[in-house]
């Protein structure tokens, strides 16, 4: 039994997101800007909220590059998301270089409005996974995997070191220190469009304090935002994982049951109080069921055959059946 936040480790491993900053950026004394301007981090956060960006743009694209302490590139990534008929669609692609110590080579992910499919390739294996969202968790999870700026963090003390104007753009330098750490911190340099308060670029450098007291650079991650590019996934991962009900491919027929709303009140809903869904997935696909509550998985209606979370649902055969029980209902 694991929470949905812990279940999405695979999907989140490529999304080392931006850290935020706090404080005001007063520019009224800068003669290089024609009109006096005051900017706060709260205003930046509101302008760059992912839902706010989708209200102003058809698509949002984020590119990422991570360098190690020696400035060697370890990872590059591209994220893109849009909104179609009130559903957020998204995809990302991460590449790991020979300088990376992660053991991975590439990761693709695609979210289609209700599910999220991912394909991970490492030096020795290829893994497929499918995240199935229950109780309206889809949109929030998908948005959480996409870099945002500035992000809201707890237990971090943030200070604005400088704010200036250059070539018609605002440059904001921030230092953030972890309150629970004895010397670890990161710095952020934001480049902002003063007309919209949208962050155009951000460079985040992490520093770590060693036992000797020496502080050294850990890595630097650079982010760049662009808008209204054509929405086009680099790889259609969903089609590699999920198949239509009338397809002829040799796949696994997965049936999963979930307590239907109202069943706890004795209402006649679904099959004996269960809602049932049927999908067809590629053999060997790791299935993740995500919910706001912890979940228990069972292979039988009587709930006597638990499915180990780490072993997961066995999709190697012709069919598989899962009964999903939220923890508070699991008596």
Give the predicted meaning of each segment.
Residues 18-89, 163, 235-249:
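N-terminal leader/targeting segments and the immediate start of mature chains
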Residues 11-19:
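Bacterial N-terminal signal peptides
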Residues 1-8:
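Bacterial N-terminal signal peptides that target proteins for export
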Residues 285-306:
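Surface-exposed interfaces of beta-sheet-rich extracellular modules
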Residues 314-330:
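Conserved "repeat-terminator" motif of extracellular CCP/Sushi domains
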């Amino acid at each position: 039994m694991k929470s949905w936040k812990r279940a999405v480790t695979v999907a989140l491993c490529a999304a080392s997101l931006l850290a935020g900053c706090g404080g005001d950026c007063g520019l009224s004394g800068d003669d290089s800007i024609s009109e006096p301007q005051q900017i706060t981090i709260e205003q930046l956060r509101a302008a760059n909220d992912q839902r706010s960006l989708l209200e102003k743009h058809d698509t949002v694209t984020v590119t990422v590059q991570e360098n190690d302490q020696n400035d060697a590139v370890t990872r590059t990534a591209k994220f893109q998301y849009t909104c179609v008929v009130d559903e957020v669609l998204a995809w990302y692609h991460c590449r790991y270089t020979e300088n990376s110590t992660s053991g991975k080579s590439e990761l693709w992910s695609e979210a289609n409005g209700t599910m999220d499919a991912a394909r991970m390739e490492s030096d020795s294996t290829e893994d497929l996974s499918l995240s199935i969202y229950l109780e309206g968790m889809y949109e929030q999870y998908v948005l959480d995997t996409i870099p945002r700026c500035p992000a809201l963090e707890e237990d971090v003390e943030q200070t604005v070191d400088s704010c200036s104007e250059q070539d018609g753009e605002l440059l904001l330098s921030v230092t953030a220190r972890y309150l629970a750490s004895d010397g670890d911190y990161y710095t952020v340099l934001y480049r902002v469009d003063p007309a919209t308060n949208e962050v155009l670029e951000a460079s985040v450098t992490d520093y770590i304090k060693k036992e000797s007291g020496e502080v050294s650079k850990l890595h630097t991650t650079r982010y760049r935002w662009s808008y209204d590019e054509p929405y086009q996934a680099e790889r259609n991962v969903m089609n590699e994982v999920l198949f239509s009900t009338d397809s002829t491919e040799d796949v696994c027929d997965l049936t999963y049951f979930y307590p239907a709303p109202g069943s706890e009140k004795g209402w006649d809903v679904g099959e004996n109080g269960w809602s049932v869904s049927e999908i067809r997935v590629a053999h060997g696909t790791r299935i993740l069921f995500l919910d706001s509550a912890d979940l228990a998985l069972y292979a039988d209606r009587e709930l006597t055959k638990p499915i180990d979370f780490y072993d997961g649902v066995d999709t190697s055969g012709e069919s598989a059946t899962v009964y999903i029980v939220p923890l508070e209902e699991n008596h």
